[in-house]
């Protein structure tokens, strides 16, 4: 079960496994890695579509991230040690991809976010249209942001909005889609 994503039907208890490649300190599906928890205040990395027929999730490939051992002083005579993937400045981050699983077809598509793989997806937001999810894409320097409208059936993306700053772009949760599923309100410091 660790590092994989499952769906459980409340009424029947039936469980469906969405991913099967999760492995400790290798691949995480649907849960954030250390960087996303610290930098973007993200713990869970999955989001249901408004019609509950699709689930978008992030996949973190940590296989090229170096490990770090932390001492955990528990009050006992000897401390515990925890080793986990911990990228330091300039070192490899996890390779992150956005996926969309369809509960009817049981198929998963990968969002096409372009050629640059050294990026962040600090936010995913479904529009009111259950076939469109918007991915916030941010470069490694965190000074170039794109909102990508993503087709849930194909993974094809279109840039809705782009912001660049010489220094830094702060991430927030101020993206609201209106009832038509196309119009949105976005707050910005630019």
Regions found by a protein language model. Give the residues of each.
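Beta-rich, blade/repeat-based domains predominating
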Residues: 98, 123-127, 174-176
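Short loop/turn motifs that cap or connect beta-strands within the blades
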Residues: 19-20, 111-115, 161-165
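A conserved hydrophobic secondary-structure block that centers on an alpha-helix together
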Residues: 1-25, 116-122
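Short loop/turn segments that connect beta-strands within beta-propeller blades
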Residues: 10-13, 21, 102-106, 151-155
């Amino acid at each position: 079960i660790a590092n994989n994503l499952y769906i459980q039907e409340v009424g029947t208890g039936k469980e469906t496994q969405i991913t099967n490649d999760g492995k400790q300190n290798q691949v995480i599906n649907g849960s954030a890695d250390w960087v996303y928890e610290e930098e973007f205040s993200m713990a869970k990395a999955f989001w249901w579509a408004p019609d509950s027929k699709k689930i978008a999730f992030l996949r973190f490939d940590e296989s090229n991230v170096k490990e770090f051992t932390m001492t955990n002083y528990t009050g006992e005579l000897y401390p515990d040690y925890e080793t986990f993937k911990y990228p330091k400045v300039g070192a490899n981050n996890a390779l992150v991809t956005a996926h969309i699983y369809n509960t009817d077809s049981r198929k998963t598509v990968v969002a096409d976010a372009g050629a640059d793989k050294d990026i962040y997806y600090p936010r995913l937001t479904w529009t009111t249209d259950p076939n469109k999810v918007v991915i916030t894409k941010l470069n490694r320097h965190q000074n170039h942001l794109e909102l990508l409208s993503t087709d849930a059936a194909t993974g094809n993306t279109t840039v809705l909005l782009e912001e660049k700053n010489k220094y830094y772009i702060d991430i927030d949760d101020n993206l609201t889609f209106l009832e038509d599923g196309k119009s949105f309100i976005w707050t910005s410091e630019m």
